[in-house]
């Protein structure tokens, strides 16, 4: 936060000046003591004000955030790191929710808005990261590819019906396709971060089916494999349309048989999370229903057994 910000002017400098001036009017010889006192209090206020984590998201208004870094993962996938106003700021995004990005796109009659889930969390202050795959028809994803470091992006949030809380169910099954892994990773990391061995209370089991076309399309594989290796209650099953020779994972589309074998069976304390391309999600809704899960609604609610991001 700037030393000349309105918060400091109204909360530090003006009260300090009034204290010194008031002391001068009442008893001039006490002015040096008043100056010393205000210096100490102002210094404390400035220091603690800068060190306190502040949630910056606004659910009703778009704000502009500066692109700090761009890391290319492949020819059409990048991680965009946006800076928050000050190093101690956090987004203030509940686990399971997402943000809206907006931009004016040439040829579009009005501002285009799309939803994305950061792959960073509020444990990482001062910035947030977005993993984005650029699609030929993707207005916002293509717009992001044109941004240079120092450019800004309009962001609003949080939004979404899912708010994950520790132990909200005994066992979670996940089915993700492509960039649909981002909300899953957010939940997975929150669960593992809050395990008893890490000082938390979350004992939720998590099984993930992650489907992609080619091996090189598997996003965040290194991080996912590391999490699975460190946590015995988190398991991943990869599925590829075009597997390499010697592939031991699933092949083709995700089937009811794969779901039955790899994910928990229907129960009152079980939840299935879905995120991926629309055709895949449509197929997964039918598959989970055929296995005895409650039929997924067109628009998911937190209490649903099958929840679609």
UniProtKB/Swiss-Prot annotation:
Entry EC no(s): 1.6.2.2
Name this polypeptide is given: NADH-cytochrome b5 reductase 1
Cofactor(s) needed by this chain: FAD
Main location: mitochondrion
Organism annotation: Aspergillus clavatus (strain ATCC 1007 / CBS 513.65 / DSM 816 / NCTC 3887 / NRRL 1 / QM 1276 / 107)
Gene Ontology cellular-component annotations: endoplasmic reticulum; mitochondrial outer membrane
Gene this protein is translated from: cbr1
GO biological process: protein histidyl modification to diphthamide; tRNA wobble base 5-methoxycarbonylmethyl-2-thiouridinylation
Pfam families registered for this protein in UniProt: FAD_binding_6, NAD_binding_1
Reactions that this protein is recorded to catalyse: 2 Fe(III)-[cytochrome b5] + NADH = 2 Fe(II)-[cytochrome b5] + NAD(+) + H(+); 2 Fe(3+)-[Dph3] + NADH = 2 Fe(2+)-[Dph3] + NAD(+) + H(+)
Domain of life: Eukaryota
Family note: Belongs to the flavoprotein pyridine nucleotide cytochrome reductase family.
Span of the signal peptide: none
Topology in membrane: Single-pass membrane protein
Localization, UniProt: Mitochondrion outer membrane
Pathway(s) this gene product operates in, as recorded in its UniProt entry: Protein modification; peptidyl-diphthamide biosynthesis
């Amino acid at each position: 936060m700037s030393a000349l910000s309105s918060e400091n002017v109204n909360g530090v400098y003006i009260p300090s000046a009034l204290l010194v001036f008031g002391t001068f009017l009442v008893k001039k010889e006490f002015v040096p003591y008043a100056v010393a006192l205000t210096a100490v209090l102002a210094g404390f206020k400035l220091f603690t004000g800068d060190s306190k984590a502040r949630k910056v998201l606004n659910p009703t208004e778009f704000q502009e955030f500066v692109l700090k870094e761009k890391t290319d993962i492949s020819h059409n996938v990048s991680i965009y790191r946006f800076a928050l106003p000050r190093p101690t700021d956090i987004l203030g995004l509940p686990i399971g929710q997402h943000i809206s990005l907006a931009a004016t796109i040439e040829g579009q009659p009005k501002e285009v808005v799309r939803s994305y889930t950061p792959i960073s969390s509020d444990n990482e202050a001062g910035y947030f990261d977005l993993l984005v795959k650029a699609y030929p028809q993707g207005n916002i994803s293509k717009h992001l590819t044109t941004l240079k470091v120092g450019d800004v992006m309009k962001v609003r949030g949080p939004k979404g019906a899912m708010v994950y809380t520790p132990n909200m169910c005994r066992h979670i099954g996940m089915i993700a396709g492509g960039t649909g892994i981002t909300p899953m990773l957010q939940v997975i990391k929150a669960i593992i971060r809050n395990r008893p061995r890490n000082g938390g209370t979350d004992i939720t089991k998590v099984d993930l089916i992650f489907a992609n076309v080619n091996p090189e399309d598997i996003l965040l594989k290194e991080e996912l494999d590391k999490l699975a290796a460190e946590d015995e209650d988190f398991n991943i099953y990869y599925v590829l349309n075009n597997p390499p020779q010697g592939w031991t994972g699933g092949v083709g589309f995700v089937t009811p048989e794969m779901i039955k074998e790899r994910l928990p069976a229907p129960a009152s304390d079980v939840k299935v999370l879905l995120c991926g391309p629309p055709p895949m999600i449509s197929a997964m809704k039918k598959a989970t229903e055929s296995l005895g899960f409650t039929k997924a609604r067109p628009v998911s609610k937190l209490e649903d057994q099958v929840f679609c991001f």
